[in-house]
Amino acid sequence: MKYDLIIIGSGSVGAAAGYYATRAGLNVLMTDAHMPPHQHGSHHGDTRLIRHAYGEGEKYVPLVLRAQTLWDELSRHNEDDPIFVRSGVINLGPADSAFLANVAHSAEQWQLNVEKLDAQGIMARWPEIRVPDNYIGLFETDSGFLRSELAIKTWIQLAKEAGCAQLFNCPVTAIRHDDDGVTIETVDGEYQAKKAIVCAGTWVKDLLPELPVQPVRKVFAWYQADGRYSVKNKFPAFTGELPNGDQYYGFPAENDALKIGKHNGGQVIHSADERVPFAEVASDGSEAFPFLRNVLPGIGCCLYGAACTYDNSPDEDFIIDTLPGHDNTLLITGLSGHGFKFASVLGEIAADFAQDQKSDFDLTPFRLSRFQ
């Protein structure tokens, strides 16, 4: 059988692409080296932030606003356990932070609902938070967090129900191109399609070694917290920048555990076995201490943690482009640790590509040619 579309990597973007392409009436094969959702990529750990006033650059705002619409739509499939939780996101940092300046600029340009607070205003609204006098907070009331593993599970189930073929626990070992389209090689045999989407995450270079993507081992952990830090108590998700520039992110507490991670740093790795489990690197358990000690002093000890991987591009902006020389193969990679919130819209973009439809978005900033 020749498919309309083969998806290589069915984690966040791949799961969304499989659903949207199948829903559009295409004959789709989703593949993954493991059984998604799984612990081998970048999507595990239950939750991911979604921010609209984007500190990484205004070019992302149209994408994330469309992503939010799609997340809201997907959440209606799980109303008892919503995929999106509108907790709000407070962005904390020094008043001269470049990241916060970008957040404010994005909010102004796109007329987003963002409230600016000074240090006293932050601590008055959330007494659990402590910040220096020179700090400000930009509170995104319409943002929040996503249930990452639940989202992937939902997409995969919906795609399957719509007739999508799924080949999991089956690594793709090679991609070939010819006049008939794309052929993938797997341990289960060869499969052909008119087009392919490569969204294989951290280990995309195993298939396409020429891509400028660097895997980085990252960790996040859960710390002892009480009901003051919960959504029920209106405690928000957050990003925070320390005076030395280190950047952290976190979520309201659930079941007396608050999840936090450090966005920058990590360990450069070159193979999957180098991503050792949480606590096997000496700094894992204490990585969040500078933020917790200074900003959330009421949080207790580290309960447990996990390791994941970022697929970093050289400039930490996404790569969304066709494979050079092969216009029938779309690459979505280099998401650099801030991609999950965009998974829905990136999946839709992939489905549009498979249908020969022009994207509604300006994807020029994400082309591979910027690295030449």
From Swiss-Prot:
GO terms for molecular function: flavin adenine dinucleotide binding; N-methyl-L-amino-acid oxidase activity; sarcosine oxidase activity. Binds 1 FAD per subunit. It comes from the Bacteria. Gene3D superfamilies: D-Amino Acid Oxidase, subunit A, domain 2 (3.30.9.10), FAD/NAD(P)-binding domain (3.50.50.60). GO terms for cellular component: cytosol. The keyword Oxidoreductase applies. The keyword Aminoacyl-tRNA synthetase does not apply. It holds the Pfam family DAO. Keywords: FAD, Flavoprotein, Oxidoreductase. InterPro entries: FAD-dep_OxRdtase, FAD/NAD-bd_sf, Me_Trp_Oxase_MTOX, MTOX. Belongs to the MSOX/MTOX family. MTOX subfamily. This is N-methyl-L-tryptophan oxidase. It comes from Shigella flexneri. The gene is solA.
